[in-house]
Each structure stands twice: as C-alpha cells, then as structure tokens.
Amino acid sequence: MIKEFKKFIMKGSILDMAVGLVIGAAFTKIVNSFVDDILMPPIGMILSGIDFSNIFIVIKKGTDTLGNYNSIEAARNAGAVVIGIGVFINAIISFIITALSLFIIIKLFNKIQEKTVKKEKDEKESKEKVCPYCYSSININAVKCPNCTSDLDVK
C-alpha cells in the first residue's frame, strides 16, 4: 500500500497539481493585496474617501446598545450581525482580476503550444514524403517504399 501511495504521489500530474495549487495560492494573495492596498484606496478617494472594506449593514445590533460602529471589525467584535458589502465588492474585484489574469496566461500558453506543435509538424513534414503508389508517409530519402516495396524515383 505504501508503494502504491509513493507511485501515486510521484505521478507527474499530481506534482503538477501541487505546484499549481501553491502558485495559485501565492497569486491569490498578490491579487488580494493589489485590490485591497493599491486599487481600492484611490477609487475610494475619488468617491469621497470611501473605504470599501468598511461598507457594511448592521442586521442586528451587538452588545453596544448605540449600534454606531466605525468599522466592520468593531461591529463584529461587539457581537453585531453584519453584511460586509465592501468586503464582498473587494472579493468580486479580486476574482475578476484573478480570472482575467489566468485567462491571459492560458491564452498565451496555448498560443506558444500551438506554435511549438506547428513547428514540430513542419519539421516532420519536411522529413517525409508520400509514396505515389500506396500513399503512405515515408522518409524523404527513401528509394524504396517500406510499405508496398515499390521503387521510387530519386530526385
């Protein structure tokens, strides 16, 4: 059972997935920091100094009977039930940036992969010709077809 587990873990796809998860988690932290620390503060400043992370609705007041909370953390610490609209907006923006970034990365990767496959195909085609008798693909230097054994014209 341990040997099977080692074999399973050492498969390339499992290792690729693990690396992808680690890189994805790091990338998510970078995007979240970009949204929270770089993108949203100027947008909040343009919109009359709004801090999006502190936009919230109190559904039920907490232990503080006044219910005037300066931040979502203060409301939650007081035991209030809140809907964190601003935090949700930040999460949506982070998701959109992450999805767009991944889309661009995958598109570039696919384009590079297509060029590589096309180059390999062109190289393969330049090393082969078609037998005029059986229409099999054969080496360009062949003087006799290995499939139908016909003699070929040498050019």
Curated annotation (Swiss-Prot):
Role summary: Channel that opens in response to stretch forces in the membrane lipid bilayer. May participate in the regulation of osmotic pressure changes within the cell.
GO CC annotations on file: plasma membrane
Family matches, as HAMAP family: MscL (MF_00115)
Membrane topology: Multi-pass membrane protein
Gene: mscL
Location(s), subcellular: Cell inner membrane
Family of this protein: Belongs to the MscL family.
TM region positions: 8-28, 38-58, 85-105
Stated name of the protein: Large-conductance mechanosensitive channel
InterPro entries on file: MS_channel (IPR001185), MSC/AndL (IPR037673), MscL_channel (IPR036019)
GO-annotated molecular function: mechanosensitive monoatomic ion channel activity
Domain of life, source organism: Bacteria
Any Pfam family hit: MscL
Keywords: Cell inner membrane, Cell membrane, Ion channel, Ion transport, Membrane, Transmembrane, Transmembrane helix, Transport
SUPFAM superfamilies per record: Gated mechanosensitive channel
Subunit-level organization: Homopentamer.
Main localization of the protein described in the UniProt heading: membrane
